């Protein structure tokens, strides 16, 4: 009996030294430092950085971004955020929050008291204007985080598993384009149709973004321009579309290390990739030269058109010295099967959860049977 009591008292005293706040511009240098110095471990360890300004993508019309920081004895030790925007739920636009960017200083490994108090602080902030749903993703091989978050501990929100998600990194080299079927936005002069067509398409999926013209204009400051779109038109309407969104000007993935066996095999893997057109393993210290597929419009049953569209985006990416195209699908999405068959891609698996607190956030059981389709570029 004394053991649990002592543990609670030690946790209480330790946690009392931690202060939580909503982050502002003054916190920018320390947040970026925390992201740089605390890579995500795995077979390929990477740092997800936000240079030169963590807040560069804040202020997009229709989005509410809130970042929480934790300080222990004045030192920033943890950061996490939530982006609330319009996403489709059961065919209708709803206010949906995505919880992401959680990073705890590795020197404080095991300090789950900080995470518990951070989630409680976030819950208190959300009571004034909560989203209708919240969701998040956790890497499938991050067993430690999954074990903690799925346990339903006191003071923690409920994590309800809703599906597996697969992010693809498709190498762009050695592709032949499919023109003249494809054209870019400036040629087609789509205007509002570039918003209405993706929205009509996305209504068939869960958590897919609901776009607006205002945010599309704002994205030009973040590297998404009219020339980045490629489209297919039939009978005066858009039947397929996609955009190449290079976010490296404000969001980077840096290769920090490889598992020993993978480091040893890297030269052979890259030599084979050069011959086969498969994905190469970048050198340690390099920024991954990737861009995201955004504003994807493609019917599930149009398998040939999907492959042609992604091929055309690969050609566009290669011309810009982008080495990988990144996009993601739920594991039960037929489009994933098509791309696995047509492209040699590297896969990263994660698990999607609906997150909720008592009285805040909708439950997973309220979702109908539509396929999950959050856009990787917004996660």
What does each of the following model-derived ranges do?
Residues 79-85, 96-112, 117:
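Long, hydrophobic/aromatic-enriched structural stretches that serve as scaffold segments
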Residues 67-69, 75-85, 98, 237-248:
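Conserved beta-strand in the GNAT
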Residues 54-72, 78, 131, 218-231, ...:
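A short helix-loop-beta-strand connector motif used in the catalytic cores of GNAT acetyltransferases and
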Residues 2-55, 61-63, 67-69, 98, ...:
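Short amphipathic alpha-helix that is part of the acyltransferase structural core
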Residues 2-12, 138-179, 240-379:
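Active-site/acyl-donor-binding loops of N-acyltransferases
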Residues 104, 109-125, 302-315:
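Conserved acetyl-CoA-binding loop-helix of GNAT-fold acetyltransferases
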Residues 108, 116-230:
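Contiguous mid-protein beta-loop-alpha structural module that forms a pocket-lining wall or clamp
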Residues 200-204, 213-247, 251, 315-322:
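Non-catalytic interaction/regulatory modules that flank or connect domains
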